[in-house]
Design a protein with these regions (language model features):
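Gly/Ala-rich beta-loop-alpha elbow adjacent to hydrolase catalytic centers
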Residues: 86-91, 95, 115
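Structural motif
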Residues: 9-11, 82-84, 110
Length: 277
């Protein structure tokens, strides 16, 4: 990896979330194309992925491990590379901790977050976590089989335990982790935030999701969690877009009509990603 990094000028790093791995993001890069047919991955000299244990290891520890692995690969404060991160869900919290608490702002040039719970998620509370993980796993089994085992493992863990996992606990809006992260100084690098909203969801190729929304998404579970606010099932749009606008540069924020698991396959998600590069 270090040899490839040494030969590259522009590097893209992908970081997954609480459910799934980076394979889905990689495929999304290839599907997101500009007017000339050039895909996002083709706009970088090198694409790297960071897969990590995402249930038991505290997010801050994962961020420190990320810093060490990047440095070992030749990505550090003194390098001559342009490093962009595309991250999903909890991967954004890992990346933000690295950038804002571990001097990663000297390494990263641009952070792009999809569905990141920047000020917390209902996943941080056991009852809500059980309900949401059940919905997401049902969706994954029927539409994204490759990531279904990750969701299944999460459901199994939550149903057998009276407590949530350490990483889910850190996503509670009142957790010390969330409070500390959002008290960080301005990192001084561009952040781009993409927030899914299922309220007007109509993806023609995703009939299962339409049925789920009709049965559950507009029912008592989500009404209790989000009231009338926009959300991508797992996270409210207010949380995804919860980074203050008084930073320099101010974070760029946009809403897309998709859910938490199809940012990288839905028409709206792919269009948003293609437009960023």
């Amino acid at each position: 990896v270090a040899d490839k990094v040494a030969a590259a000028k522009s590097v893209l790093l992908l970081v997954h979330g609480i459910i799934g791995d980076t394979d889905g993001i990689v495929e999304g890069l290839k599907l997101a194309t500009d007017a000339d047919g050039k895909s996002v991955d083709q706009k970088f000299d090198l694409v790297l992925t960071y897969d990590y244990e995402n249930l038991s290891t505290p997010i801050s520890e994962t961020a420190v491990l990320l810093k060490k692995q990047l440095a070992a690969a030749g990505l550090h404060a003194e390098d001559d590379k342009r490093l962009t991160l595309i991250v999903h869900s909890m991967g954004g919290l890992v990346s933000r901790w690295f950038i804002e608490r571990e001097a990663g702002n000297k390494v990263v040039d641009h952070l792009v977050m999809f569905g990141t719970p920047n000020v917390g998620s209902p996943f941080g509370k056991i009852d809500a976590a059980r309900q949401l993980s059940g919905v997401l796993t049902t969706l994954a089994i029927n539409t994204f089989p490759a990531i279904a085992p990750y969701g299944g493992a999460l459901v199994y863990l939550l149903n057998r335990s009276k407590k949530i996992s350490p990483t889910l606990e850190q996503m509670n809006p009142t957790s010390e982790f969330i409070q500390t992260l959002n008290a960080s100084a301005d990192p001084g690098i561009p952040y781009t935030i993409v927030a899914g909203d299922i309220r007007d969801y109509h993806e023609s190729a995703d009939q299962l999701m339409a049925k789920l929304i009709a049965k559950v998404g507009r029912g008592i579970v989500f009404d209790t969690l989000y009231q009338d606010a926009g959300h991508d099932i797992a996270v409210s749009d207010d949380s995804i877009c919860g980074i203050a606008n008084d930073r320099t540069p101010a974070p760029t924020k946009q809403n897309v009509i998709c859910h938490h698991l199809n940012y990288f396959v839905s028409e709206a998600g792919l269009k948003a990603m293609a437009a960023l590069f």
